[in-house]
Amino acid sequence: HRRGAWAIGGMAAQIPVRDDSHANEIALARVRADKEREVLEGHDGTWVAHPGLVSLASAVFAEHMAGTDQRDRRLEDIEIDALDLLQVPRGRITEAGLRDNINVAVRYLAAWLGGQGCVPINDLMEDAATAEIARAQLWQWIHHPTGILDEGQNVTTELFLGLLREETGAIREEIGAEAFDVGEWRPAAALLEEITVAGSFEPYLMKLAYERLD
C-alpha cells in the first residue's frame, strides 16, 4: 500500500468435500475465517484453490471492504526491520509431521509422474510447492543439528527410511496392490528417498522429476 500496489492475500487450499457434509462445513468455515482475517488486516483481494469457493471469498470481502480496495489503509502500528525477517521460527518436530511430509510428498510425486499437476490430497488442493516444502523439511530435519523430535529422538536417515516404507505400505494397502503396482508409487518413493538422503540439498525437486518422465 505504501507503494500503491494492491495487497493480495494467500490462497485457501481447501476444496469442497462433496461426499461428506460435515467435512465440507469444516472446510468452508476455515476458508471463511481465513478470508475474514485477510480483509480485516487490510488486504485488497484474495484467491482460492477451487472455483466453488469464489463466491464465499467474494462475499466476505464485500461485507468488510467498502470500496474496490484498501490501499489508503496503513498498518502504522506494526514495525518490522531486517533483523525480524532473519529470525528462525521456533517450533516442534513431531513424528506425525514427519509422516505427513513423507505421505504427502509420495502422493503428490506419484500423481505428478502420472500426469497431474494439481492434486487433491486430504481435502486440500496441492501443487509442486507442497512437495518442495515437504521434501525440504525432511532433508533439513535429517541434516540439521536441531532435527530432533519432540520426544527426544534424532531425525536420522534410518528413521526416515523406516517411515517411508511404512507410509508407502499404508498407501498400497489403502488403494490396493493392483492400483499401486500400475501407478507411479514406487518411482515416487524412490525419488523422495534419493533427494532426502542426498548429502547436499537439491535446489529443485521437479528438475529430477522431469528426468524420470517417459
Annotate each PLM feature:
Residues H1-D214:
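Expand to "…catalyze enediolate/carbanion chemistry for C-C bond making/breaking, isomerization
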